[in-house]
A protein has these predicted regions:
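Generic detector of low-complexity/intrinsically disordered segments
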Residues: 9-14, 18-20, 46, 51, ...
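Secretory pathway export signals and precursors
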Residues: 29-30, 147
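Active-site or metal-binding loop neighborhoods of secreted/extracellular toxin and effector enzymes
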Residues: 163-210
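Secretory targeting and sorting signals
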Residues: 1-29
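ADP-ribosyltransferase catalytic core
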Residues: 119-123, 129-175
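ADP-ribose/NAD+-binding catalytic cleft of ART/PARP-like enzymes
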Residues: 31-123, 131-133, 153
Length: 210
């Protein structure tokens, strides 16, 4: 009888140990979102993208194809000039038949939520939650340069109203575009020095909500 109890206890302990080991292996095997560089080249974005259910970036890249329907080499030949990306004309706004950008001045009111893929030294924003393909930006903008901001993603809330140029985004980088972008312009916001997201943060116009 006692031998049987000892055998059951040993089996129970072995099961717990095995389960714990397997759970640890599974946890270690789960990749971090937007980790590494695709094929060792950060221009191509991260090796691993979040699943559609992984907030906050997963839903924004669901179905995303980093090269569109092109191969890697054709994509780079079209959009990489040797020292940087070939960005679209007129700051990426959709163009009228005469080549003028479709944009208008808009005041972003307090509590408006915005985001961007890229460093805080940039001058473009979008409404929070816009799909990545509608932004028509390169795959490199998803690369994790700062581990504190996976997928290079930053989210903000307006704390003091300010004006921007807003308008529809033209297709580029083999992405559909069609979203709305907000372009910062020093002429629209009083102050000194270069106007970028970092300036808006330090001057009380935005707060981070990551």
């Amino acid at each position: 009888m006692f031998a049987g109890k000892r055998l059951l206890a040993a089996l129970f302990t072995a099961t717990l140990v095995l389960f714990g080991v397997n759970a640890g292996v599974s946890a270690q095997a789960a990749p971090e979102v937007c980790a590494g560089a695709f094929q060792g080249d950060n221009r191509l974005g991260p090796e691993t993208l979040p699943k559609p259910t992984q907030q906050p970036v997963g839903p924004l890249v669901a179905g995303y194809k980093r090269f569109g329907d092109l191969g890697k080499d054709a994509f780079l030949a079209k959009y990489w000039n040797g020292t940087g990306w070939n960005y679209p004309p007129q700051d990426g706004f959709w163009l009228k038949p005469d080549g003028a950008p479709i944009k208008y001045k808009r005041t972003l009111q307090k509590n408006t939520r915005l985001d961007r893929f890229g460093s805080e030294f940039g001058g473009f924003l979008a409404h929070k939650g816009a799909h990545y393909s509608t932004r028509a930006i390169p795959p490199q903008s998803l690369y994790t340069f700062d581990p504190a901001y996976r997928c290079n993603y930053h989210a903000y809330q307006v704390t003091k109203a300010f004006a921007v140029w807003e308008g529809p985004i033209a297709p580029w980088f083999e992405q559909s575009g069609g979203g709305l972008q907000q372009k910062l312009d020093r002429a629209l916001v009083p102050g000194d020095g270069a106007l970028n997201v970092a300036w808006l943060l330090s001057n009380g116009y935005l707060v981070r909500i990551n």
